[in-house]
Amino acid sequence: MRKKNIILAGALTLMAAAISACAPAGSNSNKKGLEAYQNGDYQNAVYLFKQAITQEPSEDAYYCNLGQAYCAQGYYEEAIESFTQALNLGGSSFYSYRGMGLAYNGLEEYEKAIESFQQAIEAAGSLDSSCRLDVVGYRAEAKMKLGDYEGSLEDYNELIEAGYRLRDIYQLTGNVYLLMDDVDQALHCYQECLDIDNRNYEGYLTLSLIHISEPTRR
């Protein structure tokens, strides 16, 4: 299996198989698919990844990339099938389970999403710590949507302790506290968010709305 040239594309991570000067046709189609994905041309990306699979059906990375492209279009069931095929071919458990979690999240099947994210976290191994923390954030979001606010806070606090994307994480943590009707903790989190970036419009807007609804807290 080839797992070089990891390409970040928005919220999703696409795996690119190693491409050499004498690369086979599948690799060329895969490369074009990655370029299409990065340009937001997801429909063409799907076509190109399928073409790469036809040319090299045993290359697991192509199935993983296809799953990501399906996810980007909202075709979550097709994405899950592609990620499952990548796993069956011995593909990267981390990227496949991460993608499956995102797909289940899109289907609002949050328990399955959390399970997939957990499997991705366990498979992170020696990958850069930001890869694992990224998935912890997705798991926190899924727990919040499931109504497991305590579990969501546990994940977000782990990210805060790690110093990971603090502005965004404080904002999201404040949102969870609001759902729990803990206005004081929510205000604390939003203030932390603004202390990091005083240009954060969302943070100011949320604080303003809280003060409007809770005038005695001024």
Question: What does each model-identified segment do?
Answer:
Residues 26-27, 60-61, 93-95, 128-129, ...:
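Helix-start (N-cap) detector for alpha-helical repeat units in TPR-like alpha-solenoids
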Residues 207-218:
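Residue-level detector of conserved catalytic or cofactor/ligand-binding positions
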Residues 31, 65-68, 72, 99, ...:
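Canonical tetratricopeptide repeat
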